[in-house]
Amino acid sequence: MSANTRAAVTRTLSKGKRGLRRSLHFVPGGNDRMFEKALALSADSLILDLEDSVTPGNKIAAREHVCQWIKETDFGDQECLVRINPQDTTWGSDDLRAIMEVLPDGFVLPKVASQQDVDYIDGVITELEQQQGVEVGAVSLILIGTEVPAAIFNLHQMAHSERVEGITWGAEDLSGAIGAKAKRDENGNYLEVFNFVRSTCLLAAVACNAQPIDAVYVDIKNPEGLARECKTGADMGFTGKITIHPSQIEIVNSAFTPTQAEIDEANELIAAFEEYEKAGKMAFTFRGQMAVSYTHLTLPTICSV
């Protein structure tokens, strides 16, 4: 396979700091029982949460708990991420600086609205990395880039920071911000405005070589609905999804992991590209369909590269 072909496929199955990043599982900050349980789950990434799952009166204690968790825990293959509070809150700045003392793999940033928001946090992290003698860029960022309306029109600029490894989206906060009465129709499908935001997140992430991460599915008692949404997301081009309940993790991992049949087909397609490339041809028929460029090498291909 040529170098160009390899470059074309490396985005399609995304990796975090420690391995694959298919499932990103929220763990409420300060809840020792849930944290201990999460370490035994098959989630690729754990998001230790200091924002929505923590009441205002418990914010400082939860921050101290999370710092202690990171300091004392061997996460193994699980990526350790922390969702801090927004920087315009009472807790945001202290969250960032305190968590940086124990060096997580990355931060999940809620309610960012502009490139200036991301640049500011990037600058603070860079300063703290230098103070601690670690490589600049070691700590990554994942943006929740659609929680305020203004952010949707700034996603491309926000994602341009080299520190940004992924972009996800969310309908919950956005629905309140725009005054939406519902997020889904009677069939469980997103209303048009949320479909637009979902697609915009995907396109902005891919355009900036960041991972597109699909939003949480809040109906934890509807595994069939989750599976359908995972399939739609994977078909669109998302390579991971956020989870909020342990029962969701295996469904998400399965949806964003290629089957053996897909891997076999990808291997055949790679071989066909190489054969026709040697013959000076870049358009040919593969399994009854026209293959005309390296973009046909999608998610399963990376498993054989």
List where the protein language model places each region:
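Expand to "…catalyze enediolate/carbanion chemistry for C-C bond making/breaking, isomerization
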Residues: 2-299
